[in-house]
Amino acid sequence: MQQFEEVHSILEKAKKITVLTGAGASTESGIPDFRSANGLYADANVEMYLSRGYYNRSPKEFWKHYKEIFQINTFHQYKPNRGHRFLAELEEQGKDITILTQNIDGLHQLGGSKHVIDLHGTLQTAHCPKCKAGYDLQYMIDHEVPRCEKCNFILNPDVVLYGDTLPQYQNAVKRLYETDVLIVMGTSLKVQPVASFPQIAKREVGATTILVNEELTGQEYNFDYVFQNKIGEFVEGLSSRK
């Protein structure tokens, strides 16, 4: 209980809060953890199907597999959960809060957060590789192979594919160097370069670091506070301190 009280006080006083989220932030909305032992990424071919090279070589086949892997046609059923709303509420209270998410579901934005850096892109949109016109999720659902209405080019998904660089990485690191508090929620911290963020925040910036994850990550030494909880449980614990 004392940890909850201390963290509540830290968040009350913090000027700039950065939150790094992973799959655990969305599993409470019913979205499967694609990287789990039984997840869709367990298929040996998935990395090929979701690669930039495969999109370039076989864009029609790419879209078929992309839709199957991410279950695009049923994605509207997923809604923001208590964790998403909690972060949006912090922002509504006037906190300078930025979310760095590894998730591609767009639920932080749907939950009301305005300052979100999608490290791995988003499933919610795609764009024309020629004219850059944007298209939403419903357009992708409605068209077997989505094409630009103006150029007729097959759309490029806004998810970062294997073989792509992380276009938002530098923006994320810049934010880390400005932050007072880093909260890491629902990620095993196994994927680089994101796995280095807690060390940057604690060792180089001197920020207060907080981990919320059901499983231990092996990086507990980089955190001032460790909560081995579901995110919803953590939020409930903080709420009871008000």
Curated annotation (Swiss-Prot):
Its cofactor is Zn(2+). One of its GO terms (molecular function) is NAD+ binding. Binds 1 zinc ion per subunit. InterPro entries: DHS-like_NAD/FAD-binding_dom, NAD-dep_sirtuin_deacylases, Sirtuin, Sirtuin_cat_small_dom_sf, Sirtuin_class_U, Ssirtuin_cat_dom. NAD(+) binds at A23, T27, F34, R35, Q102, I104, D105, H120, T187, S188, N213, I231. Zn(2+) binds at C128, C131, C148, C151. The active site is at H120 (proton acceptor). It catalyses: N(6)-acetyl-L-lysyl-[protein] + NAD(+) + H2O = 2''-O-acetyl-ADP-D-ribose + nicotinamide + L-lysyl-[protein]. It is found in: Cytoplasm. Keywords: Cytoplasm, Metal-binding, NAD, Transferase, Zinc. Its EC number is 2.3.1.286. Its main location: cytoplasm. Residues 1-242 form the Deacetylase sirtuin-type domain. Nicotinamide binds at F34, I104, D105. Signal peptide: none annotated. SUPFAM superfamilies: DHS-like NAD/FAD-binding domain (SSF52467). GO terms for cellular component: cytoplasm. NAD-dependent protein deacetylase which modulates the activities of several enzymes which are inactive in their acetylated form. Belongs to the sirtuin family. Class U subfamily. This is NAD-dependent protein deacetylase. The gene is cobB.
